[in-house]
C-alpha cells in the first residue's frame, strides 16, 4: 500500500505539534490544499474524555501521482518530525471536502458536530468545483485504461483483472480500489468485455491448433 500512487491525500495536523507559521509553510509547497476548521468538538469514545484531541484535517492535491509515503516525508520535512503520523489516499475529493466540516453523508449519519464551512482555509488556489470535475474526467480516463488492458491482455474475468492489477497496477496508475470505483455501475459492459476476451482467447487457441 505504501507504493500506491495517487494525487489526492488527507492527513491530520495537531496544533501542539506544528510551528506557528504552519499555514505559510504549507503554501511554499505550491500545491492546492483545503484545511478544515479546528476540530475541537469531536466527541471521544474514551471513557472520561469528552472530546478528541483538537486537530485539523488537510485535503492535499498533488501535481502528479505520488505515494502517500512521499507526501508524509515532505510534510514532516516542512513542519517537523512529529507534525503528522499517517497520510491516506482520498478516493473521492468531494466527499473528503464535505468531511472537513462533517457535512459528508457518513459524518451526518454518525451525527458528528458540524463545523462552519466559512472557516475552511484554501491554499494555492484550491477550487473544489475543479477537482469534482476532474474526478469525473479521471474516472472516464481510468475506465478507458481498464478497457484497453482487458483487450490487450485478453483478461477473461474479474479475477484475471485483479491479478493483473496486483502485479502491474503501479505502471498504469491503478489499484484494485480504483478499478472497483471506475467499473461500478458498468456490470453489463464489463460482461461484454470479458465475454469478448474469452471469445478472442478461444479463437486464438483454435488458430494455434490448425
From Swiss-Prot:
GO BP terms: namely: DNA replication
Q: GO CC terms for this protein?
A: extrachromosomal circular DNA
Q: Which domain of life is it from?
A: Bacteria
Per its UniProt record, what InterPro entries does this chain match? Answer: Plasmid_rep_C_sf, Plasmid_rep_OBD
Q: Keywords in UniProt for this one?
A: DNA replication, Plasmid
S-S bridge residues: none
Pfam families cross-referenced by the UniProt entry: Rep_OBD (PF01719)
Q: Which is an annotated GO molecular function term of this record?
A: DNA topoisomerase activity
Q: What does the UniProt record say this protein does?
A: Is essential for plasmid replication. Nicks the positive strand at the plus origin of replication.
Family stated for the protein in its record:
Belongs to the Gram-positive plasmids replication protein type 2 family.
Q: What is this protein called?
A: Replication protein RepB
Amino acid at each position: 500500500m505504501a507504493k500506491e500512487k495517487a494525487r489526492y491525500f488527507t492527513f491530520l495536523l495537531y496544533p501542539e505539534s506544528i510551528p506557528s507559521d504552519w499555514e505559510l509553510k504549507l503554501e511554499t509547497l505550491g500545491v492546492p490544499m483545503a484545511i478544515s476548521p479546528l476540530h475541537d468538538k469531536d466527541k471521544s469514545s474514551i471513557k472520561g474524555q469528552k472530546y478528541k484531541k483538537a486537530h485539523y484535517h488537510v485535503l492535499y492535491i498533488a501535481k502528479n501521482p505520488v505515494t502517500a509515503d512521499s507526501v508524509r516525508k515532505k510534510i514532516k520535512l516542512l513542519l517537523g518530525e512529529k507534525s503528522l503520523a499517517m497520510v491516506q489516499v482520498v478516493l473521492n475529493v468531494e466527499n473528503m471536502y464535505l468531511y472537513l466540516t462533517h457535512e459528508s453523508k457518513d459524518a451526518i449519519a454518525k451525527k458528528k458536530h458540524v463545523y462552519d464551512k466559512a472557516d475552511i482555509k484554501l491554499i494555492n488556489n484550491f477550487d473544489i468545483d475543479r477537482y469534482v470535475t476532474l474526478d469525473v474526467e479521471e474516472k472516464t480516463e481510468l475506465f478507458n485504461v481498464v478497457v484497453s488492458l482487458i483487450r490487450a491482455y485478453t483478461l477473461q474475468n474479474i479475477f484475471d483483472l485483479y491479478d493483473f492489477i496486483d502485479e502491474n497496477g503501479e505502471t498504469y496508475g491503478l489499484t484494485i480500489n480504483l478499478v472497483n470505483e471506475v467499473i461500478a455501475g458498468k456490470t453489463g459492459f464489463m460482461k461484454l468485455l470479458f465475454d469478448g476476451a474469452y471469445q478472442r482467447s478461444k479463437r486464438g487457441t483454435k488458430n494455434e491448433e490448425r
